[in-house]
Amino acid sequence: MRIGVVCPYSFEVPGGVQAHVVDLARALRGMGHEVAVLAPADEHTPLPDFVQPAGRALAIPYNGSVARLSFGPVSYARVRRWIREHDFDVLHLHEPIAPSLSLLALMVAEGPIVATYHTSTTKSRALNAFQVVLQPFLEKITARIAVSALARRVQVEHLGGDAVQIPNGVDVRFFADAKPLDGYPREGPTIGFVGRFTEPRKGMPVLLAAMRQLLTDMPDLRLLVVGRGDADDLRREAGPELADRIDLLGQADDETKARALSSVDVYCAPNTGGESFGIILLEAMSAGTPVVASDLDAFRRVLDDGMAGVLHPVGNPIALAGALRGVLSDPERRATLAAEGSRRAAAFDWSVVAGQVLRVYETAIAADPRHVGEAL
């Protein structure tokens, strides 16, 4: 099968949707299919050989964060040329309503089109304003996928049409085989955090407040952080009690992230909202690391209602401290959580998820057997 995939977010900055697109493409290629990906990126961005850069993107506030998106006449022309140069059996668009390449491809293309919705954010004012304009293009979508029940609910309630729920995938073996970083595991307890630590919804202030309560019982406690943000701002926020206990790796490649997850005693996701899934939880679970996470609906579903990890009330540092203490002070509980987490993660392995996506492609092609081309 010849598959075209469009990612709306720039590959110049790592993100969950970008990782999903690349991992899905690799899994499908491993199954013998031809896959080409189009995404915002400049010519100097390191990319897999199956990803074609569509030019630099602009940083735009979107979905409670800042996304790097590509839109305008130059991007439109590049999308048209890409579709014209390939003879795809199916076109797979991620986040087709984001003002970027996926929406442009939806405007340009005709034929079997599959759309995946990642976000759980309800309809924005901008989408309300352009709903009438967008609706004819949304009706071109042949089949829809939502990565979570929350994303599916947004699709059904605000965009019309149902969606098949297929979760994000994870390369379980990649994380399971990762070796700890040099100097790890330590004698004292180490908490792990991955993400843009200066972004409020990622919950770093909640985690720092919880750590302050643990220092009396755990004087050797440290925090290993992987992600983007201002290191000086983080240390100032941590204060004199915690600043020297933070090991900051900065933005890291996948191998370093996997090794970091394998190095810590517990992975903490203190997020306060805006999450539709929680792929980082699965990555930590695949690495054999116990997870403590906010009791967000998306995280609860990934953690199997708390069977595969510990959930704590959102935004409550006292409760988070108690949850972390309960895991860090009990080796048997850590081992049990690690085993349950590994079991749960196996259900999300890309070998399973890619097969589910492929069946949606087959359904879309059966409904519209034309090859993908430019709309007249």
Segment roles from a protein language model:
Residues D305-G306, V310-P317, G326-E332:
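Conserved acidic donor-binding segment of nucleotide-sugar-dependent glycosyltransferases
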Residues V266, P290-A293:
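Short hydrophobic beta-strand element within catalytic cores of glycosyltransferases
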Residues G183-K202, L208-R212, L224:
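Conserved donor-binding/catalytic core segment of Leloir-type glycosyltransferases
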